[in-house]
């Protein structure tokens, strides 16, 4: 589980990349201590032993979401 620190996020170009196996996911938006968060939960692959159990969590606060939108807009040339 991780609250993503977008301030220190850097691009790393790799020599070898792979497409990962698809996994089910959901998202939630919530407020805590006056801050709004966007959270993505993944549930692992279909062959996973414990179906439906959260595998990974990524949380973004409002500032991180703004930086992510800017980054995606640049990288995908929207």
Show the residue positions of the predicted features.
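Positively charged, low-complexity terminal tracts
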Residues: 1-78
